[in-house]
Amino acid sequence: MASVVPLKDRRLLEVKLGELPSWILMRDFTPSGIAGAFQRGYYRYYNKYVNVKKGSVAGLSMVLAAYVVFNYCRSYKELKHERLRKYH
């Protein structure tokens, strides 16, 4: 018989749609909890793409691509006006 995992300990993909609001309210939204979530995400990314036996530049290039897309989205408002100019 499978053991029942409490709602607080379930991952997001294991939560049913009806349980989602109560699952979100159980999360830790303190600064240390948010920092811990970012730290866990960083370690998961690092161990999956960077810290591997046969590593390549794929993991670092994904970070660079995300950085470029983020900065483009951030400055799109100014770039949009320059695109419409004819000479300068």
Curated annotation (Swiss-Prot):
Cross-referenced InterPro entries: F1F0-ATPsyn_F_prd (IPR019344)
Residue positions where N6-acetyllysine is found in the record: K16
Localization (cell): Mitochondrion; Mitochondrion inner membrane
GO cellular component, one term: mitochondrial inner membrane
Pfam families: WRW (PF10206)
Entry superkingdom: Eukaryota
Positions where N-acetylalanine occurs in the chain: A2
Modified residues (Phosphoserine): S3
Coiled-coil stretches: none
Entry keywords, A to Z: Acetylation, ATP synthesis, CF(0), Hydrogen ion transport, Ion transport, Membrane, Mitochondrion, Mitochondrion inner membrane, Phosphoprotein, Transmembrane, Transmembrane helix, Transport
Membrane topology: Single-pass membrane protein
Predominant location category: mitochondrion
Residues annotated as transmembrane: 62-79
Any one Gene Ontology BP term: ATP biosynthetic process
Function: Subunit f, of the mitochondrial membrane ATP synthase complex (F(1)F(0) ATP synthase or Complex V) that produces ATP from ADP in the presence of a proton gradient across the membrane which is generated by electron transport complexes of the respiratory chain. ATP synthase complex consist of a soluble F(1) head domain - the catalytic core - and a membrane F(1) domain - the membrane proton channel. These two domains are linked by a central stalk rotating inside the F(1) region and a stationary peripheral stalk.
Subunit composition and interactions: Component of the ATP synthase complex composed at least of ATP5F1A/subunit alpha, ATP5F1B/subunit beta, ATP5MC1/subunit c (homooctomer), MT-ATP6/subunit a, MT-ATP8/subunit 8, ATP5ME/subunit e, ATP5MF/subunit f, ATP5MG/subunit g, ATP5MK/subunit k, ATP5MJ/subunit j, ATP5F1C/subunit gamma, ATP5F1D/subunit delta, ATP5F1E/subunit epsilon, ATP5PF/subunit F6, ATP5PB/subunit b, ATP5PD/subunit d, ATP5PO/subunit OSCP.
Family under the similarity heading: Belongs to the ATPase F chain family.
Name of the featured protein: ATP synthase F(0) complex subunit f, mitochondrial
Name of the encoding gene: ATP5MF
